[in-house]
A protein has these predicted regions:
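Bacterial N-terminal signal peptides that target proteins for export
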Residues: 1-10
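Short glycine/proline- and aromatic-enriched beta-strand/turn motifs that initiate or cap beta-hairpins
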Residues: 22-104, 258, 262
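Residues on the lipid-exposed face of transmembrane beta-strands in outer-membrane beta-barrel proteins
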Residues: 47-49, 87-91, 133-137, 151-153, ...
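Extracellular/periplasm-exposed beta-strand and loop segments of Gram-negative cell-envelope proteins
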Residues: 56-82, 102-130, 156-180, 208, ...
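Solvent-exposed loop/turn segments connecting transmembrane beta-strands
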Residues: 79, 143, 181, 204-215
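Repeated loop/turn-to-beta-strand initiation elements of outer-membrane beta-barrel proteins
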Residues: 95-100, 142-145, 195-199, 227-230
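Transmembrane beta-strand segments that form the barrel wall of outer-membrane beta-barrel proteins
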Residues: 197-211, 236-237
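Predominantly the C-terminal beta-signal and adjacent terminal strand-loop region
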Residues: 212-262
C-alpha cells in the first residue's frame, strides 16, 4: 500500500505541474500574435492563466523504490490536489519577445498499510515546480501569419515527503527531491482564418540534465475583444530524466483551455 500510494501521488504531482503548460492563445509566449495592439512605447504585454487536463504515462522511481510503469488518468488528480497554479506571461517589442511559463502544484494523501506491523498509516505529500523562461524572434510575418524562432531554459523541481504513523516505523519520515534544468528550442506559429478565429501551435525540443525534453501543441482560438481571447486545443509534453535512483521518463498529454488578458 505504501509503495502504491507513494508512486501514485508522485505521478499526480508531476503530472499537474508539468508542466510545462502553455494553453494560451496567439498572444501567449508559445504562439505569437499578428495583430497585437502596441503601447506608446512599442511594447505589448499579455497574461494568461490556463488549465491543462493532462494524463500521464511512463516510468518513474522515487524513495529508492523499483522503477514502475504508470498510467495515471486525469480523474485521479483532484482526489489529492491541495493547490495548483499555472500561468504564462509575455512581453513583446517588434519582432522580439520574452516569455515565462510557471506551474506549481502541491498534493497529499494517506492510506493504511495492509498488515499494520511496520506502520498503521502512511502519509505522502509532494510539491512540484516547473518554469520556462525564454526569448523569441519573428522570422516570418505577413497580414495573416507569423512564425517565431524560440529558445529557453526549463527548470524542474520535485520534492516528496513520506511520514509513517503507528507500528514499528511510527514517527519516521523521509524526503526525496530532484531539480534539473533543460535547454529547449523550436518554433511557434499562428494563422488568422478570420479577424476573430485563428489557428496556433508550437514545437520545442531539447535536453540538458534530462536526456530528452520536448513539447508540442495545436489549438484554435477566438478573440472576444481587443483585450480578451480564449483558446482550446491539445498538448503533449515528454521528458526523460534519471539520476541517483530518481527516474521520471514520461509523456503527458491532454486538452488545454486558456484565457488571455492583454494590456
Amino acid at each position: 500500500m505504501k509503495t502504491c500510494l507513494t508512486r501514485s501521488l508522485a505521478v499526480i504531482g508531476i503530472c499537474l505541474s508539468a508542466g510545462t503548460a502553455m494553453a494560451a492563445d496567439v498572444y501567449s509566449p508559445m504562439a505569437p500574435e499578428v495583430q497585437q495592439t502596441t503601447t506608446e512605447t512599442g511594447w505589448t504585454f499579455s497574461f494568461a492563466p490556463y488549465f491543462w487536463a493532462a494524463g500521464l504515462s511512463g516510468d518513474i522511481a522515487q524513495f529508492g523504490l523499483p522503477e514502475a510503469h504508470v498510467d495515471a488518468s486525469f480523474s485521479d488528480i483532484f482526489d489529492h490536489l491541495d493547490f495548483g497554479a499555472m500561468a504564462i506571461g509575455e512581453a513583446r517589442y517588434g519582432p522580439y519577445s520574452i516569455f515565462a511559463d510557471v506551474m506549481y502544484t502541491k498534493i497529499s494523501g494517506s492510506a493504511g498499510t495492509p498488515r499494520g506491523i511496520l506502520a498503521v498509516e502512511v502519509e505522502v505529500s509532494s510539491e512540484t515546480f516547473a518554469g520556462l523562461l525564454g526569448a523569441g524572434y519573428s522570422i516570418y510575418e505577413d497580414n495573416a501569419a507569423r512564425i517565431d524562432l524560440v529558445g529557453g531554459m526549463r527548470v524542474w523541481s520535485v520534492e516528496s515527503d513520506l511520514s509513517f504513523s503507528g507500528g514499528i516505523l511510527d514517527g519516521v519520515s523521509r524526503s526525496d527531491e530532484a531539480t534539473w534544468v533543460d535547454g529547449l528550442a523550436g518554433f511557434r506559429a499562428t494563422y488568422s482564418i478570420t479577424p476573430e478565429i485563428y489557428l496556433t501551435g508550437w514545437g520545442l525540443v531539447g535536453a540538458g540534465q534530462a536526456d530528452l525534453d520536448w513539447d508540442v501543441a495545436a489549438a484554435i482560438g477566438y478573440r472576444f475583444s481587443d483585450t480578451i481571447s480564449a483558446v482550446a486545443g491539445y498538448r503533449a509534453l515528454g521528458v526523460d530524466y534519471s539520476d541517483d535512483g530518481f527516474v521520471f521518463d514520461v509523456v503527458q498529454q491532454g486538452p488545454i483551455l486558456g484565457l488571455v488578458v492583454r494590456f
